[in-house]
């Protein structure tokens, strides 16, 4: 039997964005482009890979890099501003070793600080607030 190679998990961050809606608290989800090979067409929270720049010359600050990534992804994918200090670390998990693509993801939750919501049209096709 051939031994299967385990793919290294890429560091990533996701942000669960909240706002006060007319009928109560709402959460933002974006529909991933159907052209993407990883969960194309799925409704997801904004997020993505942690870039080297997210470490801001602090290679040992994994949580800080993840926060900066979450803020950046909210802006890139949804046009929304997020205060990194208002984010709460919700959870972290890593995709199982059997998956062909793996991520070690930091999950944050926090309020939207401003901006105009707009799907980027590349990774995210649509945005919707859910209650």
Whereabouts are the PLM-identified features?
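N-terminal leader/linker segments that precede catalytic domains of diphosphate-processing enzymes
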Residues: 1-131
